[in-house]
Amino acid sequence: MWRLRIGAKAGDDPHLCTTNNFLGRQIWEFDANAGSPAELSEVDQARQNFSNNRSQYKACADLLWRMQFLREKNFEQKIPRVRIEDAKKITFEDAKNTLRRGIHYMAALQSDDGHWPSENAGCIFFNAPFVICLYITGHLDKVFSEEHRKEMLRYMYNHQNDDGGWGIDVESHSFMFCTVINYICLRIFGVDPDHDGESACARARKWIIDHGGATYTPLFGKAWLSVLGVYEWSGCKPIPPEFWFFPSYFPINGGTLWIYLRDTFMAMSYLYGKKFVAKPTPLILQLREELYPQPYAEIVWSQARSRCAKEDLYYPQSLVQDLFWKLVHMFSENILNRWPFNKLIREKAIRTAMELIHYHDEATRYITGGAVPKVFHMLACWVEDPESDYFKKHLARVSHFIWIAEDGLKIQTFGSQIWDTAFVLQVMLAADVDDEIRPTLIKGYSYLRKSQFTENPPGDYINMFRDISKGGWGYSDKDQGWPVSDCISESLECCLIFESMSSEFIGEKMEVERLYDAVNMLLYMQSRNGGISIWEAASGKKWLEWLSPIEFIEDTILEHEYLECTGSAIVVLARFMKQFPGHRTEEVKKFITKGVKYIESLQIADGSWYGNWGICFIYGTFFAVRGLVAAGNTYDNCEAIRRAVRFLLDIQNGEGGWGESFLSCPNKNYIPLEGNKTDVVNTGQALMVLIMGGQMDRDPLPVHRAAKVLINSQMDNGDFPQQEIRGVYKMNVMLNFPTFRNSFTLWALTHYTKAIRLLL
């Protein structure tokens, strides 16, 4: 039976290092002797239910760890469930009891170190690169046991589309990229190709061949096929390591790149510069024949370089871009890769790329920027020296990317511990039940205090293409080391509320200087246009995005400003200014003023805002209005808020809820769920906007109807149903945030209970 282990309890490894005793660490371990018959039956039932309903609900409910934690804590829901018949007759007690039921349920799910675990996955292209890398390095059997493989196969089979392919995420249509690499993964795991049958492999291979073959894989896929030896580097767009020599005054250089692309490309450029290819095996030779409609020896690789299946092509590749990459290829391969320049420049560039890799690996404790760069870095370190400590340190961190749920084993981003914890704590702090959950609040506050970055990256970090981090919070844990602006804002919001509480109640508080450090980070990250970026201060010219070689997502070259990050920053800085009116007051005021103008400038004609990190226009509208209201705006004095309220009232469904399709994100226009169904996460977000927009003072019925939906949706144990996938990454890749079904619904009920209490 699989069990989730937290922090130092997950065991130690001499090749692991940590900044805070592995706080937030999440490791899944298999124990063949664990679990009673009843527990094993419960897990099997959850798996079967997902498989039976996977065509309707493709994002899992993340049940396995929840079952485990509730059992370990002997949780029993003692507050009676509420059922509403008439929305007009909801009482304060009805809403409050529903809220308390949910709060008590969430308190039982808190880990011992104070955070809330959760899946943060959904991308179908994360698993296979880990399998390919470990196959190449000869460590596949050491890292992935038979039980790991069983769960990985479960995941692939559960999320294979009816046409035989796999999408970029669990919701999407089939992509060449994901179908090819998942096919390879199946073959590495020993699944027979079964060319004439109806097996997963046979259907996947048919899809690949019917759509032109693996030469139509986008760049990331081509890179993995090249290192495996089932594609040729000459068929890839160039990734020259000489790029890292570009000085800071160049329009594009290592410092201007979007941090995630930078982290990925430094390892890709190393592998490209060395033209590394794995030693051929019988399986590799078979794959060369299975992935293409023509013989491998007859493929013209130069013609394949710019190919991309139409199913994968989200960000169009222009003629200007094609010309640009042809010129780069000519210069890179015809000059830099030939004598004497290969000795004078190329070899030095390869060494420089590896120096960057080692620096960034050490600075992130070998977690790197996420699942995509992690595995490229790991392979590059093995190519440099298979016996090196660098590679062994990478191997020791692979388990940190593994998550197991009822749909199987998936590689996740690296976790959303801080992000989810900050939201859950804000809900609990707003629920007015402090005395009932004091130990939960104390542990949560401790987790945030200990997870803040107290130093900048090590050494000469500017020349190593890193930005400041002191005072920030990351997305997952302190060890990873990358500050994220909205995680800073939401975590600081919690810490400011805790700061206002008595020490007798909450215990040890953060030093005020650390609160100041967090504010300094936010002020630093605001751009001239008033928006705030997410990982680093934005730099570089926007026209550079025209040159992006990444076909399946958008805005990948540069750091950008984001609506949600700006809204969150305004909220917390408005609170900070009230609690600490003497610290950088004028700068904070200026930040808020510019931030409000930025938010208003992004509003769409229908009154909504596009959400960059959630689904989508409802999500964006929530963060926008939250920021506007925190800055002192109201329905009466702000046209933007009035338009936002009208937008939500216009799209409220007959049931009283809201539900938005993930298709809104790539299409960039509002699309309701099929059948105008309700989603509790969107309903919670919309309900909060209406209350913040003063709807209770004008016509409270739409709010009451939405509250009825949430109250009646709550399950017997206090949980809410997992319905649709609710996160997104770079417009076109969906992410599963199962905890959103709890945090946004309960957060909405905190607003609602306070609103109806005022009517008493």
UniProtKB/Swiss-Prot annotation:
It catalyses: (S)-2,3-epoxysqualene = tirucalla-7,24-dien-3beta-ol. Its EC number is 5.4.99.56. Pfam families: SQHop_cyclase_C, SQHop_cyclase_N. PFTB repeats lie at residues 149-190, 641-682. InterPro entries: SQ_cyclase_C, SQ_cyclase_N, Squalene_cyclase, Terpene_synthase_CS, Terpenoid_cyclase/PrenylTrfase. It is an enzyme of class 5 (isomerase). One of its GO terms (biological process) is triterpenoid biosynthetic process. Keywords: Isomerase, Repeat. GO terms for molecular function: lupeol synthase activity. GO terms for cellular component: lipid droplet; plasmodesma. PANTHER family: TERPENE CYCLASE/MUTASE FAMILY MEMBER, TIRUCALLADIENOL SYNTHASE-RELATED. Converts oxidosqualene to tirucalladienol. This is Tirucalladienol synthase. The lineage of its organism: Eukaryota, Viridiplantae, Streptophyta, Embryophyta, Tracheophyta. The gene is PEN3.
